[in-house]
């Protein structure tokens, strides 16, 4: 290859040598050939790299760049040695620029056409050392080659990150340290799962323990939230405490709320060791009732021993509703609080009403029976109509109920004691007098008729008059 490359400039320069054959010597021709040698040696590697260059304009630009040097040689008289050295340097600069342009075209084609982007990297790296070896004496020329090399490295490293992230991850041949950077955070998550699971178990256990101890101390969820707000400055609602006990809060909020509740629980148990000491929420504020007014804290459920319960049962059988002094006496005898004894009697009376509703009712007259027609009718003397007697359970007096303007129904009345005057009789309704029991068969009107015989009713005035001939009892005829 060296001989062929050396022959090319000899043929090219033979035309000007034949034109000025007499003025040139053979040493000068040999010197010109040697000076053009590096240029030809530098062009041959470019011709070798032409298969990698997709653009067909590369060789044409080389020929155009070589033509001015070829035309300028035969134009003037025989140039001196300094002029030839300058021309060879200019040719080297032009070839260096051509190489830089070809490298940039290759890089652009790698970005736009070739997807992998790493198959053309070895030829480009192989091309640059040859260009540097062919020019050992020139300083500006290596700078031209280093600049494309740096840009090539930058483009090759940035191309997989920007345009092809999926191919860069799947291809094991690429050795880019930036491609494996997003993967380590995924590996950090699994070690945190055992710790999170243990924390969840601990939170669940604490929530159950907190609820049991809170109920044992007699605090409500609202009391806990308000007490924490007054004591520690973190006010929580009843819903928040309820969701914490039910494990319905987020993991972050559960972890944030746990130390506060644990601190409050320890303080509450410490303060409630002695029953005389107030609870933590009472130290900070008066507890609120349902209507928002100051009230009292819910008391603990009182457990009554068996022997005390038997004594209370005996007292209840003797007197179901003792007075305040009797309750105080019973409390002193049983060494109990007066309020506890009073509440027990109230609850016991309610229980007795549920068990025996009839025995607990007061002794009152039985309610009235439904109306039933008498088998006999009483016909007044004036013939105004028939008035059957009815039986009512009110008291000594009986009333007359009129079903119509002329006919009324009355049932016989059972009275505890009846007089002749019919004491306590109701006022007349539409000039209808009260009803009194009749005498048995005589004119004596002081005793009621125990046989339930027919009564005599006077319609003329308030006081009835009983006498023979006023009433004619007649049997009921349907």
From Swiss-Prot:
Regulation: Transactivation activity is enhanced by transcriptional coactivator POU2AF1.
Protein family membership: Belongs to the POU transcription factor family. Class-2 subfamily.
Highest taxon above the source species: Eukaryota
Biased segments, Gly residues type: 416-425
UniProt xrefs under InterPro entries: HD (IPR001356), Homeobox_CS (IPR017970), Homeodomain-like_sf (IPR009057), Lambda_DNA-bd_dom_sf (IPR010982), POU (IPR013847), POU_dom (IPR000327), POU_domain_TF (IPR050255), TF_octamer (IPR000972)
Gene3D superfamilies: Homeodomain-like (1.10.10.60), lambda repressor-like DNA-binding domains (1.10.260.40)
Residues in POU-specific domain copies: 195-269
Lineage of the species this protein comes from: Eukaryota, Metazoa, Chordata, Craniata, Vertebrata
GO molecular function, one term: DNA-binding transcription factor activity, RNA polymerase II-specific
Principal location class: nucleus
Source organism of the structure: Sus scrofa
Gene encoding the protein: POU2F2
GO cellular component terms attached to this protein's record: nucleus
Protein's UniProt name: POU domain, class 2, transcription factor 2
